[in-house]
Amino acid sequence: MRLLFILISICFSAFRAQADNKKLYQQLDSVIAHRADYHALKDKELQNVKLSATYVTDAEEKLRLYEQLVNGYSPYIYDSAMVYVQKGTHLAQQSHLSAYYNRFQMLKARLYVFRGFYIEAKQCLEQLNIPPSDTHQNYLYNCAQSALYFSLNVYCENSEFSEHYKKLFNEYITKALYYYSKQDAQYYRLKGVQLYLSDGPLKDISACLNKAMSLTKPNNPLYGMSAFVLSKAYRKHKQYELQERYLLLAAMSDVMSSS
C-alpha cells in the first residue's frame, strides 16, 4: 500500500525533474517484477521465527522471538503483529518480566499510532512505569511518544494544534536520541527526521539520512523510510530531480523489504 502512494508521488513529481533517473526507473521495474520473491523470502523468515518460538521453552527467549515477529509484521500487517503483542504481554505477565511487559505495551502503542488510534496509544503509554536506569526502555518509550506526536502533527497540519504537537515530538525525539547509540542507522534516521521537522539546514538533513542509508541495506525498512523523508526535504527545497531519485530509492526499498 505504501508503494502505491510513493509511485503516485513519483508520477506527479517526475515531469518537473531536470533528469529522468532512467537507471533507477529500470531498477524499480526489475524490483517490482521480483516482488513475489521478496515477499516469499520475508514470509520464510517469519515462519522460521514462529517455528523457533514454538519449541523454545525459556520465557525470555520466547519473548524475544515474539518481539521479533511484531517488528517483522508491523506496521503494515496490523492483525498479525497484534497477535504477538498479546502473546508477549500475556507471557511477560505470567513470567513476572516487567521489562518485557513494558516493551510489548510500547509495541502496542506504536501499532495503535500506525492505525490512527491516538487516544488508545496515549493511554497505553501513560500507564507505564519506566525505570530511569533502563536505557533501552527509555529509548523505546521516547520513540513511541515521538511517533505519536509526529503523527498527530501530520494529522493536524496547518491547524492551531500543529505547533503544539511538533514541540512535543521534538521533546521526545531529543530524549530518544540521548538514549541511543550514535553508531546506528536508526539514530541518524531519527536525527534526520528531527532536523526535517524543525526546518534544519538541508545539508544536515541530507547528511544524517544518507548516513542512515549507508549503515543499512535497501531491503531494510529503515533504508526506505530514510529515503522517503529525504525526498520530502528535497521537495520542500524545490530540488525535484533529487526528490525523484529518493522517491525511487524508497519505492525499491518498500518492495524489497516486503512491507
Please identify what each model-predicted range represents.
Residues 15-259:
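A "functional boundary" signal
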Residues 3-12:
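Sec-dependent N-terminal signal peptides
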